[in-house]
Amino acid sequence: MSAYKWGQLQQLAIMHDVVQPVYSGIERCKGQFFFQLTEQQWNQWEKAIKEAKDNQETYETDKFLKADHLTNPFLNRRLQAILDDENSDTRTRQMLLLIIRVARHILNEGVPVRQLIALGVFLRSDAGRVDFTTLEKWLRQLRLYRIAQLECTLLMNLFGFETHEMPLWNGKQNKDVERVAQELTEFTNTRAQDFYFSQDSGNIFVHTSNGAAMLGHIRRSARYFHYFPSETLTNFFASFAHSLSHIEE
């Protein structure tokens, strides 16, 4: 593989927060005869691994993207009631949170590879202990059913899941999945937290740090409105307000 293609692979791995599993795969193959990386390329991967670990600590503390809340107040009250119900099944609640986490990342960052992988791993290891009848009821109560169908289709199309592994899937192939999955190869893909607002001292005007990221977030909100309308609108304004919190008085 050419140096250019290795660079493309590294960019994709960094962008989708899967540097560690990709690097692990590279290490397992390094003994193969036709598999050759220069010392500089190995150093670049090791640097990317270190930066990914450092960034992960900051990234996971971002309360805005946590799965245990929704930005729509009405839906969030329903979610909290579900999570506070001690009689509900723990595995089913865990599955619900994984679906919400993927949905929130889709709205704010585009298709999230790492989060989809986590959902897929849980499905293959713990699906037998999930009450899918209750889960579907919760998803409909939270208006999440349609975007959950998109997640099912992405798992089948991108990661080779079979229909029998997707108890939630309604059997209807999503026609938009190829267009949605195109985000995976867009190097201009930007995260919602890549833009924030600031105000210079002595200046009454507020400006954004990354106009392209802000426009990307607007386009993403419009793209996924069909799948989760009740949350998409409030999520956009909540993200906007979250960005305003960076303003230095």
Model-derived regions: residue spans:
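Conserved NTP-donor binding/palm subdomain of two-metal-ion nucleotidyltransferases/polymerases, i.e.
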Residues: 1-249
